[in-house]
């Protein structure tokens, strides 16, 4: 204490050796904020709901609505969640929109790097699907996942491809796929149609997708009646945007039991 008084006599009574810290005789509690893992990605801000995909004879169709939900609020109503990767591959993503934008930037740079080589090679749907499984599993293993579920569709060497990857890196291929709430509402309708007719035509597949989008708009609070449809055939990729489905709410007063 004598040495402390000597310091105070030189620097003044208000001088502290450790500003903001403990004083002699006091207990000091180490602040805990900032010492835990980063958790930004565990709280997605703007999210998109279902993405649907179905194979048809000669190609693949993917569809997604254009709503970005900020929590429970329908905040952004014209955002795209379908991406043309190249002339044979298209990607659709549900989940956190910021993570999707990051993925999109990475993939676009990969495509540019591949084109600079100039060897005529391009990423096939199956190659992109395999790469996505590694990316998602790697981020999940770092406890910092990309909060997305992705559907990749395309045509390569005359063969249609439709693959699924979630934020844990779980991946599989199927003739019909749906993410988000669509996995519960749209997938049964898609499977029923494809099991009854495995060789759907392009028009039949499109009508089926539009029917499922309408069901989702009626039943999914995070869905919207504006949507995009991507069609992939040997001729290339075509994305039609800002389409709108016609709805009829005349029977809404008859719906009960959900109050």
Residue ranges of model-derived segments:
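Long, low-complexity N-terminal extensions
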Residues: 1-259
